[in-house]
């Protein structure tokens, strides 16, 4: 079974909730660094600070990550596959030293952040929709890394 219309709608509505509050971007990176402190150096906007500090670069990067997962949901619904809009993503991830466990950390942080943003609208169905969309994106990035 492919990505359903309902799953796409769930991702769309929670994406809108995420975008409404910039503090979710800080939460996202705080969770990443709690789970994988060594990842701090991978992000130019985090490596020189003692803790996660809000900044335009942090906001832009978080919105890009969540936006790409959102776009992946749309692509999965439309065609059943994710095609990267930015062909340099594979090379960037190689350059930063990203390995498989990092994708797991980001997925967990993304799901925790969406859970927080969704509040009472959170459900297993919503979590599954984001997880499938993220896995589609992660798979496309890993493919571009090879």
Curated annotation (Swiss-Prot):
Keywords from the UniProt entry: Cytoplasm, Heme, Iron, Metal-binding, Nitration, Nitrogen fixation, Nodulation, Nucleus, Oxygen transport, Phosphoprotein, Transport
Keyword Transport: yes
Annotated residues for binding of heme b: 44, 64, 93, 96
Keyword match Metal-binding: yes
Pfam families registered for this protein in UniProt: Globin (PF00042)
Taxonomic lineage: Eukaryota, Viridiplantae, Streptophyta, Embryophyta, Tracheophyta
One function term, GO molecular function aspect: metal ion binding
Gene Ontology cellular component list: cytosol; nucleus
Domain Globin: 2-146
Protein's UniProt name: Leghemoglobin Lb120-8
Family in the record: Belongs to the plant globin family.
